[in-house]
């Protein structure tokens, strides 16, 4: 284990703490930055937690927090009188409040509070299992499944009707366009994204049908 910095602690085999008051606990845990905290409480290969950045926090298994105040899970610091290297001392230990597995938070104050989530961007937030938040201030919401819809009395069933999780590029008040999207496949089983030119083509086709109908029937048909 390696500890470098004022009041830095590295507790656990192959753990590393670098920075003023940086704390790492658990096998292979890494904390780098002022008051960075990395806590692994798992066994076997479910270890190796990384927190890099001032006040960054990571806990659980294989979770990563990169950035000032980034969080993959949440921790608290508690004062504890323990025996470390045969010397009784009052030390600060880490206690997990929320552990997450395989979570990644990248960006200042980015936060992931559920397993397998990804938050990328300043203050990006994930609160859903396997959720993805892309861009500053983006936040995930609960996934919504849409298996079918009824339009003018006719039911249409959709491919990919069950949503496993969700990807967000904004939040309730901040919206973003997604540009440079290639044309997706259009068929009954397609789950591709559709771009604007394809919708324009559909609108033109519908308009041509309406125009042909009017020409055949005449009047205001």
Language-model segments: residues:
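Glycine- and small/polar-enriched repetitive beta-structure motifs of secreted/surface proteins
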Residues: 1-180, 184-191, 197-204, 208-212, ...
């Amino acid at each position: 284990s390696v500890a470098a910095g004022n009041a830095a602690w590295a507790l656990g085999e192959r753990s590393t703490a670098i920075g003023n008051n940086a704390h790492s606990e658990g096998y292979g845990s890494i904390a780098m930055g002022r008051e960075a905290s990395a806590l692994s409480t798992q066994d076997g290969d479910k270890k190796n937690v990384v927190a890099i950045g001032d006040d960054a926090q990571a806990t659980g298994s294989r979770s990563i927090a990169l950035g000032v105040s980034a969080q993959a899970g949440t921790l608290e610091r508690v004062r504890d009188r323990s025996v470390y290297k045969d010397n009784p001392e009052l030390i600060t230990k880490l206690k997990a409040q929320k552990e997450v597995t395989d979570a990644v938070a990248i960006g200042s104050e980015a936060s992931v509070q559920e397993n397998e989530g990804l938050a990328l961007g300043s203050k990006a937030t994930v609160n859903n299992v396997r959720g993805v938040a892309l861009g500053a201030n983006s936040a995930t919401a609960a996934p919504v499944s849409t298996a079918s819809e009824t339009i003018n009395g006719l039911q249409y069933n959709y491919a990919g009707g069950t949503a496993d999780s969700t990807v967000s590029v904004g939040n309730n008040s901040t919206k973003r366009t997604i540009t440079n999207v290639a044309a997706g496949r259009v068929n009954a089983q397609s789950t591709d994204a559709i771009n604007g030119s394809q919708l324009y083509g559909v609108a033109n086709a519908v308009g041509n049908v309406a125009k042909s109908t009017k020409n055949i029937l005449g009047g205001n048909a």
